[in-house]
Amino acid sequence: TTVMEGGKRPGHFNGVCQVVSRLFYIVRPSNAYFGEKDWQQIAVIKRLVDYIGMDIQIVECPIVRDKSGLAMSSRNSLLKKNEREIASNIYRILKESIELTDKLNVSDLHDKVVNEINSIEGLKVEYFEIVDGNTLLPVHQWNDSPYVVGCITVYCGQTPIRLIDHIKYKG
């Protein structure tokens, strides 16, 4: 895929698919568990399983969050204490945006989320895409898909650290 993570990290999902398909061929699992934090990866792996024709149930595991709402990630250890506090705004803003889906169209909600996060010193949105949760194709209206997900990557801090998260709007 060449959208979101695939566009920012060329070849990344080719590598993911190569490693995961080899693992699946060796292990032959009936179920495989993947964390929802990287929503795009789940969608890619579901398509991979269909493509290679294996009967594997892909189980989506909810994001584990710290008490502030920050999605758990090994990258969080690179954040300073004040940067962790700043980063917790990502999920807060995403969560608040759910309440706006009946008031704002997709484009306006997108802009509001990006502008609100970018207005916080120490945060910079790399991308925020509102997509069909299965196909990863952009949605332009809330009724374009029964399954709508917002996928975001934000740089946090002086270093800066790249953080990913997502929010389910429908489905």
Question: What name fits each language-model region?
Answer:
Residues T1-Y33:
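Divalent-metal (Mg2+/Mn2+/Ca2+)-assisted nucleotide/phosphate chemistry catalytic cores
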Residues D38-E126, V131, G171:
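Glycine-rich, Lys/Arg-enriched anion-binding loops that position phosphate/diphosphate groups
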Residues F24-V27, Y51-G53, A71, W142, ...:
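Solvent-exposed alpha-helices and their adjacent loops that cap or buttress functional pockets
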Residues K112-G171:
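Phosphate/ribose-recognition catalytic cores of enzymes acting on nucleotide-derived substrates
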Residues T1-V3, G69, I161:
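Active-site loop ensemble at the mouth of alpha/beta enzyme cores that anchors a bound cofactor
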